[in-house]
Amino acid sequence: MMKILQLLVPTEQPRQHNYKGEIQNMNLMKCDYNKIKNWMYRNARPLDIARWKYHFENGNRNDVITALLAYQNSDGGFGHGLEADSWNPNSSPIQAYAACELLFEIDCPRDEPIIQSILGYLESGLDFDGEVWLAEIPSNNNYPHAPWWSYEDNVKEEWGYNPTATLIGFILCYGKKDTSIYIKAKDIANKAIERYMAKTNSISMHESSCYIRLLNSLESMNKDKDYFFDISSFKSKLIKGINYTIEQDSKKWNTTYCATPSYFIDSSTSIFYLDNKKSMDTELDLLISSRNIDGVWDITWNWGSYEKEFAISENWWKANLVIKNLKLLREFDRIL
């Protein structure tokens, strides 16, 4: 039986050397890619199948939007487990964040109705406390969820500008400049950056990624000549902060929930790439060699409760990892 199992587990490619004796990078083989594709079609939810087709099979952006609409509520917000660790059907800022990230992913046009409905939800003030949108909401506790999505009174202190920095980045990218929500987003952006610049300690990997989204949005605004903040010092500090946040011990990447290089770096043009090039190469090799018996990637967390629901959520997250990792491997020319 052990010999049979060994045949099913993805085998690690031996490191090859070129004629100069230099170590060559590992690559994902076509047969492995096909195995991953088959797993997706057997296990992924319709939204992630639409994303898969969009990224790898010349699929239609509209199919992703249509699938995403299944998670949207009448108030313009999102729920229903779009962020797969919280099954609350009610709209919440963290679910809106998840929707915004998917729309950024497919470069959704500004005139799509889904954009305007999200802006309307954010403008409504639901779950906004005057400074930030709350990462947790009370009704989370009534539905299956990971423990970190349990509502607690110290939600603002715990989560900071996660997901607010991403939400204001979305508003600044897609909102109209003369609207109240756009003006509000600019004010929040100033306060968020001032808070970040004043901090002497590091922030979480999740809040850091939200600040990256805000930086990207501000840079897009500057290209449009809509300057309202000097982002050079913010950008410089963010680079240093990300370098500190990335876990440098590669042995922990597959067993511990931590910030790997690819959590922040998605291409060689990333502002974080040069300082982390060696670590990035290591992670790309590890992605190829560390797939599970099904040919895909395991997640590194567990709810510790709601076992049946988590088993479903786990597959949803695996599908998300498939898309993220294959996009990454393709970007770095690691798929043969």
Residue locations for each model-derived region?
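Preference for long, amphipathic alpha-helical scaffolds in soluble/luminal domains
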Residues: 23-336
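Acidic, Ala/Val/Gly-enriched low-complexity intrinsically disordered segments
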Residues: 9-12
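Methionine residue identity
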Residues: 1-2
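Short, Lys/Arg-enriched N-terminal segments with co-localized hydrophobic residues
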Residues: 15-25
